[in-house]
Amino acid sequence: MDINVLTIDATRIAIQERQATATAIAESFYKKIEAEDGEINAYLTLSRDRALAQAAKIDAIADRGDDLPRLAGLPVAIKDVISTKGVRTTAGSKILEEFIAPYDATVVQKLEAAGAVILGKTNCDEFAMGSSNENSAYGPVRNPRDKSRVPGGSSGGSAAVVAAGTAVTSLGSDTGGSIRQPASFCGVVGLMPTYGRVSRYGLIAFASSLDHIGPFAKDVKDAAIMLEVIAGRDPMDATSAEVAVPKYSDEIGKPVRGMKIGVAKEYFGEGLDPEVKASVEASIQNLAKAGAEIIEVSLPHTKYAIPTYYLVATAEASSNLARFDGVRYSHRSKEAKTLSEMYRKSRDEGFGAEVKRRIILGTYALSAGYYDAYYLKAQKVRTLLAQDFDEAFAKVDAIVTPTTPTPAFKLGEKADDPLAMYLADIFTVTADLVGIPGISVPCGSSKDGLPIGLQVFAKHFQEATMIRVAHAVEHALAAV
């Protein structure tokens, strides 16, 4: 069996028809990881015992001839900011180097209940803060499409394992583009659901009003199936929504004829790579040929999105990361002689430079005398951004944009320029700020063979619409 072409359905059918066992499939993936991941560095921890125990359960179901669960035997990887009971969970940080999660995140529980086999935990920017996966305490992840380039961040490891074929699907988190941007850079599908669509219980918090969990997959259908499994109300997360979960995979293949699709003019201006622009515009033309009506829309406050995001996100991070103090969890400084010294030295030794930078910025934004000037003003602009999208969605069913301004950049290219790194998220942060769903789907390649992604936005809880449009883009590209 060629594990490189496995999908969710193909995996389940192969096990059901006894073409392969779940155990054999899992072992094949571990062999591939051992052979190939050393150079990519996408996995931080492998959960072999847990995975093989789960695979054995699936094989027992198949042996009895019973119906297999939806994700039976599916090899999945989990971003290392999501708790997995009994498995090391580091958030890419030295401060959690030896932390063993005491419980499973809700999304992990749901995946295993549906039959998925969790291979291990993926590398990420420390506490999900970054756009290149160069901020991990455990070394950078390399892009499987070009190992001299970044995979994107912060969920770079989760995108890379799908692109490299060392997992069939994976989970990541998205706070400012951390699913969609790496999906674009690695040439896979990355889906960020509406805020509240998927439980955040068990996610190590970066910015609680912006954090989302979502899937990576090779194609839109598998991303849709993954969302069906992990979505839904969770009593353990007060922000999760009591909204029925549709069968998103039913949208695959449905026509876009008659749909109104918006093109946001602010996303096609200065700074957009010409090859990215050409690929995205070609996909928009394909949607028009398929019968969609293309309408230009305006999102005028987009230019304020980056400063707004970095004020809101860092303010929330400074509060959330206060819990890592040397008293609980993992790292405690051995040099400290007093309690205050323990706090200071443990955090200084445990946090990396980018995390420290964001904690300082967020603490400053929340401090007396600056709260109104910065944080409160950012929240007001956030409201204006939401109004922009409300006005646009009054005219259209979905909005398409480039996912990123450029294809994947070189390792080290932006590492010493935080502002240049932050600007890499300019097309993705708006969806997080207003809580709408977004998906990145491959739409072409640069002359150097680097993947290019197209992004689709939809109204709150209208992931089905977004998936239909994304699949139409995918289908048109496959037909070329």
Curated annotation (Swiss-Prot):
Keywords, in A-Z order: ATP-binding, Ligase, Nucleotide-binding, Protein biosynthesis
GO biological-process terms attached to the record: translation
Catalytic activity: L-glutamyl-tRNA(Gln) + L-glutamine + ATP + H2O = L-glutaminyl-tRNA(Gln) + L-glutamate + ADP + phosphate + H(+)
EC identifiers of the protein: 6.3.5.7
Active site per the UniProt annotation: K79, S154, S178
Coiled coil, from the record: none
Name this protein carries in UniProt: Glutamyl-tRNA(Gln) amidotransferase subunit A
Organism of this sequence: Koribacter versatilis (strain Ellin345)
Taxonomic lineage of the native organism: Bacteria, Pseudomonadati, Acidobacteriota, Terriglobia, Terriglobales
